[in-house]
């Protein structure tokens, strides 16, 4: 178990360093057209998205975790770089979880927004006895005219958090017509 935590700590540290480096390169070379990164201009928006939960691929395949994390959720995009989200899903431990959070994604590579979702979750029996806990997860988002997708990377933390890559498809159900 300690090896798993150390390994994930190293991956998280490397990811943080790489992200920091890319942020500096985005600012340094914003005018360079060969740089694939761009800073998203913060502008007001009003979009409501619904989702059916997530499909996950767990890193520990031998543990028989639930990969079909289906449920229902809402995401309200109030800005080009930020949105709020809340919902409920059947989690990896085969129990129900609730969540609420905020996405902040100020960077893009082409149509993909890059950032994090920060919020709270509950319903995991081995984490805080099923109570609420805070989490910050790297998140990628693609949004088309009516459909979109969020991808999350969840680190393994001992027996409390089950590492996975999760895909959440979403459907836009409301956006006022622009004048």
Predicted regions span which residues?
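Residues on the lipid-exposed face of transmembrane beta-strands in outer-membrane beta-barrel proteins
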Residues: 52, 72-76, 86, 100-106, ...
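Hydrophobic, lipid-facing positions within transmembrane beta-strands of outer-membrane proteins
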Residues: 48, 68-72, 82, 96-100, ...
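Repeated loop/turn-to-beta-strand initiation elements of outer-membrane beta-barrel proteins
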Residues: 48, 80-84, 110-112, 142-151, ...
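Short glycine/proline- and aromatic-enriched beta-strand/turn motifs that initiate or cap beta-hairpins
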Residues: 30-78, 87-88
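Solvent-exposed loop/turn segments connecting transmembrane beta-strands
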Residues: 59-67, 88-99, 108, 122-133, ...
């Amino acid at each position: 178990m300690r090896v798993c935590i150390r390994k994930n700590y190293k991956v998280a540290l490397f990811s943080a360093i790489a992200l920091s480096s890319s942020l500096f390169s985005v600012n340094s070379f914003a005018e360079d057209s060969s740089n694939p990164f761009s800073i998203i201009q913060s502008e007001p928006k009003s979009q409501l998205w619904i989702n059916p939960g997530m499909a996950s691929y767990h890193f520990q395949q031998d543990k028989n975790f639930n990969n079909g994390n289906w449920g229902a959720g809402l995401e309200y995009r109030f800005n080009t770089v930020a949105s709020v989200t809340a919902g409920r899903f059947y989690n990896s431990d085969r129990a129900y979880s609730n969540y609420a959070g905020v996405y902040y994604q100020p960077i893009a590579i082409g149509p993909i927004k890059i950032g994090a979702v920060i919020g709270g979750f509950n319903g995991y029996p081995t984490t805080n006895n099923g109570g609420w806990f805070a989490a910050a997860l790297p998140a990628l988002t693609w949004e088309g005219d009516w459909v979109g997708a969020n991808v999350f990377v969840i680190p393994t933390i001992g027996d409390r958090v089950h590492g996975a890559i999760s895909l959440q498809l979403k459907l836009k159900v409301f956006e006022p017509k622009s004048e």
